[in-house]
Amino acid sequence: MPVITLPDGSQRHYDHAVSPMDVALDIGPGLAKACIAGRVNGELVDACDLIENDAQLSIITAKDEDGLEIIRHSCAHLLGHAIKQLWPHTKMAIGPVIDNGFYYDVDLDRTLTQEDVEALEKRMHELAEKNYDVIKKKVSWHEARETFANRGESYKVSILDENIAHDDKPGLYFHEEYVDMCRGPHVPNMRFCHHFKLMKTAGAYWRGDSNNKMLQRIYGTAWADKKALNAYLQRLEEAAKRDHRKIGKQLDLYHMQEEAPGMVFWHNDGWTIFRELEVFVRSKLKEYQYQEVKGPFMMDRVLWEKTGHWDNYKDAMFTTSSENREYCIKPMNCPGHVQIFNQGLKSYRDLPLRMAEFGSCHRNEPSGSLHGLMRVRGFTQDDAHIFCTEEQIRDEVNGCIRLVYDMYSTFGFEKIVVKLSTRPEKRIGSDEMWDRAEADLAVALEENNIPFEYQLGEGAFYGPKIEFTLYDCLDRAWQCGTVQLDFSLPSRLSASYVGEDNERKVPVMIHRAILGSMERFIGILTEEFAGFFPTWLAPVQVVIMNITDSQSEYVNELTQKLSNAGIRVKADLRNEKIGFKIREHTLRRVPYMLVCGDKEVESGKVAVRTRRGKDLGSMDVNEVIEKLQQEIRSRSLKQLEE
């Protein structure tokens, strides 16, 4: 009979099989009331599942991350329950958990309107408030198939036929008259599912295949309590204000159009930000001793077959042909960098060789997934590739890590989550090679005092990797940086160097990306700063304005002087009221506004205002220039007097 060991090391002995709920009740009624599920020997199970042998048990509550995920999954079933009551002929497809919520794909003979979504949410609340028990039954494959076939649920039948073995016992979850199929676990009672909101609808192909029927996807968010739900909705409201697509239009940074889906038309001010970002990255490349190269954006398909990209990636590659040869427009830079490495004999003395490129890449992303600058088809990678010996891996990874943190800190990103992905089951290379490679990555992180978590088995078949995920001011995660070891590509493309023993050896290749793509990172920065770019990045850093025509000459002189000092400056000599001009340039997020009236002309000074409305008073022009140059040169995130 089972001995249950709890997280604090205490044990409870039973003379019969028990469920997590039984154990929770044994500990106390408060824990039983809070119990959502259990974790038995590391595996999540339903609160009602029986434990027959000795086991380690943790009780899962709404305070746990697992508990919140279970609540969200059960809210997807609640959505199914409600939609079948409102529109009984709906066919249910899949309803998984996603970040911050859930969705359900449904086949419905009407297009859902906003009013429909509101009615659906209302019915969900009505059902949840009944606090009914969710009943789980493990049944045979045949019984599950018969259940859904009798209910006309063709998508569930398809899942059973194509994805579930006939000797398996699927879990059915009964919500009163509604039944759904799932691995689980789910909440034992709907009292846990009161704090949710339906967010939007979208189209989605069954199984993600455009040859299949287009279904309607209903998105929702769910939280453990009302406070957390309201906080999330508030963050969404703030995110909408910061939407880079909206700000990009307001500030005239770029646009997209139907004739070039997923391709960016950079306007002058947006391109200024892009080029300033390039200058910054180049300064770091020089500091960390990288070469900068430029490869062709199109190469023969034969090369992509050698690399393995054609077999595994061809659907995402654009192709063209000329003179009976098929070419691929590059989706990444690495094969081109190996070609550059292969030119001329390399010695161990030439290593490490650090090769960087602002590579123009293209990927055939599905049109439905395109999203402003965040998801595009044409983008510029800031990646680099380091060719080194096995002995040099640790030092080179160390350098990559320092560079990542050096660059992210410039933009004020302080919360960075790091994950180390280790060997998958299918891989190349010996266990000894993987042992050393994984240890090198781990030691490099430890030497930099960086906490990290392992993602066991999540590495690529050709090497382990480190992923850096930064969090913005709204606590949204953006996976940007990677350091990936590659023991495969150099060998596939015949890269080699002459070792100390005069023998030819294959170099290790380190793929390194920091910003990810320039376009996406500018989108992230636009939302992080809400368009209030730090002065060094701002397209226009200073606007000088006159009050009347009599100051026009003085404004032109100052404009030239600031321009000569390397400051991006514009003169506004329009015959408009000064209050109107100030308001307009404030909305354009120009960091500094210099106002010139007769008093300023006489004294040779300027009245200085910031875009945040702060009046810095009258200042000497040379003092303004000196302070601005210092702010720009240091890439400060703060403005004068902040």
Swiss-Prot record:
GO BP term, pick one: threonyl-tRNA aminoacylation
Amino acids binding Zn(2+): C334, H385, H511
Location within or outside the cell: Cytoplasm
SMART domains (UniProt xref): tRNA_SAD
Residues covered by region (Catalytic): 243-534
Domain of life: Bacteria
SUPFAM superfamilies: Class II aaRS ABD-related (SSF52954), Class II aaRS and biotin synthetases (SSF55681), TGS-like (SSF81271), ThrRS/AlaRS common domain (SSF55186)
Free-text function comment from the UniProt entry: Catalyzes the attachment of threonine to tRNA(Thr) in a two-step reaction: L-threonine is first activated by ATP to form Thr-AMP and then transferred to the acceptor end of tRNA(Thr). Also edits incorrectly charged L-seryl-tRNA(Thr).
Record organism: Escherichia coli O8 (strain IAI1)
Modified residues (N6-acetyllysine): K286
EC numbers on record: 6.1.1.3
Keywords: Acetylation, Aminoacyl-tRNA synthetase, ATP-binding, Cytoplasm, Ligase, Metal-binding, Nucleotide-binding, Protein biosynthesis, RNA-binding, tRNA-binding, Zinc
Domain TGS residues, every copy: 1-61
MF-aspect GO terms: ATP binding; metal ion binding; threonine-tRNA ligase activity; tRNA binding
UniProt remark on cofactor binding: Binds 1 zinc ion per subunit.
Primary location group: cytoplasm
Protein name per its UniProtKB record: Threonine--tRNA ligase
HAMAP family associated with the record: Thr_tRNA_synth
Quaternary context: Homodimer.
InterPro entries reported for this sequence: aa-tRNA-synt_IIb, aa-tRNA-synth_II, aa-tRNA-synth_II/BPL/LPL, Anticodon-bd, Anticodon-bd_dom_sf, Beta-grasp_dom_sf, TGS, TGS-like
